[in-house]
Amino acid sequence: MQSYASAMLSVFNSDDYSPGVQQNIPALRRSSSFLCTESYNSKYQRETGENSKDSVQDRVKRPMNAFFVWSRDQRRKMALENPRMRNSEISKQLGYQWKMLTAAEKWPFFQEAQKLQAMHREKYPNYKYRPRRKANMLPKNCSLLPADPASVLCSEVQLDNRLYRDDCTKATHSTMEHQLGHLPPINAASSPQQRDRCSHWTKL
């Protein structure tokens, strides 16, 4: 399958800018992305032993700590009061507010967190915390989809331009040698015009 960067490069180098050619480029990018993501998901399932979506959904969650017990209602309240605020900004504000609370203010939430942990141990006695790997991170050795198609495209264009310049230099040098080989030999009896013409070709 032709890569996205190769397709873009072929359109860039050609004069065919028809809608049919341009329409195929997003399809190539989606196909490459799908193949790379599918390959990574298969590898992730083999390493973790997960063979279906149900196993991911049935994963046991960690019990909430004191901060999450406190921020559960605070986050909902802040989101309602600031509907345009991003979730990351809400998390920052909640973290700052939690640090400003006194030990006495935090104590009820620590007690609630201890109760939740006790219930969790009773319900899942064999539970072991396993950090979940980020599914949106692609492996470094994935060559089906470039990390930055624009950078790859620019690299290929620069490479082609460099090769083109090298070919032009070689062709010009070969043409000059051929033309210089047919020049008459320079002697003392040559006219000034002939000497100037030979000097011009030598400088080139």
Curated annotation (Swiss-Prot):
Cellular component aspect of the GO annotation: cytoplasm; nuclear speck; nucleus
InterPro entries from the UniProt entry: HMG_box_dom, HMG_box_dom_sf, SRY, SRY-related_HMG-box_TF-like
Basic and acidic residues bias (residue ranges): 194-204
Subcellular location: Nucleus speckle; Cytoplasm; Nucleus
Keyword DNA-binding on entry: yes
Region (Disordered): 175-204
Endpoints of the signal sequence: none
Superkingdom of this protein's organism: Eukaryota
CDD domains, per the entry: HMG-box_SoxA_SRY
Keyword annotations from UniProtKB, A to Z: Activator, Calmodulin-binding, Cytoplasm, Differentiation, DNA-binding, Nucleus, Sexual differentiation, Transcription, Transcription regulation
Main subcellular location of this protein, as a coarse class: nucleus
Keyword Hydrolase: no
Pfam families, A to Z: HMG_box
Any GO BP: male sex determination
Assembly and oligomerization: Interacts with CALM, EP300, HDAC3, KPNB1, ZNF208 isoform KRAB-O, PARP1, SLC9A3R2 and WT1. The interaction with EP300 modulates its DNA-binding activity. The interaction with KPNB1 is sensitive to dissociation by Ran in the GTP-bound form. Interaction with PARP1 impaired its DNA-binding activity.
PANTHER family attached to this UniProt entry: SEX-DETERMINING REGION Y PROTEIN, SOX TRANSCRIPTION FACTOR
Protein name (Swiss-Prot/TrEMBL): Sex-determining region Y protein
Gene this chain is encoded by: SRY
